[in-house]
Amino acid sequence: MMAVSCSGCTISCGRLRFERAKCCKHEFFGVLQGSNLEFLQCKYPLFTSSSRVLGHKVNVFPGINDCFWEKHSTPLLDTINSPQDLKNLSNKELRQLADEIRSEIIFLMSRACAPFRVSLASVELAVALHFVLNSPVDKILWDFGEHSYAHKILTGRRSKFHTLRQKDGISGFTSRMESKYDAFGSGHGCNSISAGLGMAVARDIDGKKNQVVTVISKWTTMAGQVYEAMNDAGYLDCNMIVILNESRHSPLPISEEAGSQTSLNPISSTLTKIQSSKSFRRLREAAKGVTKWMGKEVHEIAAKVDEYARGLVGPAGATLFEELGMYYIGPIDGHNIDDMVSVLSELASMDLTGPVLVHVVTEVGRGLKMDSKGEEKNDKNEGRATNSKDYSSGDTSPSKTYNDYFAEALVAEAELDPRIVVVTAGMGVDLSLGIFQQKFPERFFDLGMAEQHAVTFAAGMCCGDLKPFCVIPSTFLQRAYDQVIEDVDLQNLPVRFAITNAGLAGPNGPALCGAFDIAFTSCLPNMIVMAPSDEDELVNMVATAVSINDQPVCFRFPRGIVFAKELPLLGTPLEIGKGDILTKGKDVALLAYGVMVQSCIIAHSVLSRLGVNVTIANMRFCKPLDIELIRMLCREHSYIITVEEGTIGGFGTHVSQFMALDGLLDEGTVKWRPILLPDKYIEHASVKEQFDMAGISGHHIAATTLCLLGRNREALSLMR
């Protein structure tokens, strides 16, 4: 028995019941969940592993090209409910388990159309760690959210993995509130060594013997905190293991038997095992003690011999870690289970004499199908939050992001002004900036995860009479706040801060939420703070920033998608500190900042149907405020509502302070209400769901307005 429809169809066949979403193509991925096989539209080509095909095509009706991809079985993974279930597996079974986990991640994440390529590099590493260690007694810290996906599957969260980054689902990062196996929360990266060192010191004070292992990525080695923590770990000589997962992009030769896919040779593997052996460690420590006892000259000679020997075993960079006090082991093929288990077992079984750094080399996107050019045919975004288009809704309308309009406007300005340069600390995440990089490669500087350096670097450029645009996501600018104050604002240098991904972060949750930038920039004495209401104003604010040469300026915009429309790429500079009236009403004035103008327009539409006409003011500037406009609105309205997608201490605070100091609230004829993000972290969900959770949607604004007017029953009906 079988029934098919092209829209929300139900297919019954034997004991299986199939459901699928509305389609614009006739290709789907099927996801087995119990006795159900669910469908979602597939936006990616078929992915294949190095050793197996992850799914096979099943036709529903021959000749119609209506089909789905059936997921392969995962017999070993189906038996794993916790890390303890790995303990009795052989190395061969561990390799099979890694293949099945990789299959699971590719299948489910492709279905969600979410970036996941980085997670495929750490599958074998997670398997080896949980096989050797006794988690959660032994602490495993991941400083990069995507690297922990296999870890999540192995620690009892497989059944919820399809809810990753969704409302009421599991987080895309490690979270202490989510699982006892997550020793520490990850978010911005580069924090795991510091946190792990703290745990190791606490362990030693308590007289415990558990292991502490931190996993860092090559991206986080760009951040200064990593080296501060390594230096302190070396100074304290504290026993802990740091694993540097160097994920590479280039496809490498495949060894089907061992599942190896790195350029590391057998000699390197053998030497790495020697490095991690007890006898080698003891001999080396004994030699250090003897040479120190024999005197300075002999000690220096031995150190040079030791450094030379280390050069035979590890890469040149190993000496940097050694100088920081870390005992270096590597490089290891991060996809070779046998080598990883061998090295980790040796380290776990011995009494360490200080911190150890294990260098593993892995491949980003391992297991994904390559095209004819050797490039992976899938989402190119990985690492931090991206601004790529979200296809999960099935929307295929022509659209662009705010970042696209920003980059195009900046290119247009740079063609006229050769002093304009771009400094970004986005690790290549903002793909829109690629057009600037291609057009002006010598004027484009991507510094990786080095926000502090980026800000001061841009400040130095100002001293050299350049016009730097410092492009940093809101949440990552927090890490460079000291530099923003001391190196830019205090010296009144005209760095132009383009604060991307501002506001709620949707699936990325509170870790990457850009909620605080309005508050922490608007309190700085010399900073001009502005935000566009739409893409047209964004183009104008780029032109405005170019025209400001005597003080710093910042403007924020979200990662959101807008319907693509043709705009003049050269904007018109705005008058500093001036807003605009969009709609004229009475009684209530909505003072909107940034893209919250759009929510106010929705509220205006809702309220007008209820016979309420409100004034909408597009304020544009948080600092300096349009004080004449505020005075006029206070004279003509009984209620003032400030609306912003930011936290306490931002736009609404500045407006209320001005009204209080100006005496506008003294007679009691004007009442003020703020609409802003609540004083709590908003968990991951879609942006629309987060707006409802935070109470800043158009309907919430309309309900607040009705409550001010005493129409509480109508306000409640809007919230149902």
Where do the model's predicted regions map?
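N-terminal chloroplast transit peptides
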Residues: 1-49
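Thiamine diphosphate
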Residues: 3-12, 155-191, 205-209, 230, ...
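N-terminal organelle-targeting presequences
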Residues: 29-99, 103, 110-111, 717-720
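Long, structured ligand/cofactor-binding scaffold of large enzymes
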Residues: 92, 96-207, 211, 219, ...
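Active-site pocket-lining segments that scaffold enzyme catalytic pockets across diverse folds
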Residues: 108-137, 355, 362, 402-415, ...
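A short, small-residue-rich loop immediately preceding and capping a beta-strand
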Residues: 112-114, 138-141, 182-185, 206-223, ...
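Extended, hydrophobic alpha-helical segments in both membrane/secreted and soluble proteins
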Residues: 212, 216-229, 432, 444, ...
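Helix-enriched interaction subdomains in cytosolic or periplasmic regions
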Residues: 382-390, 522-568
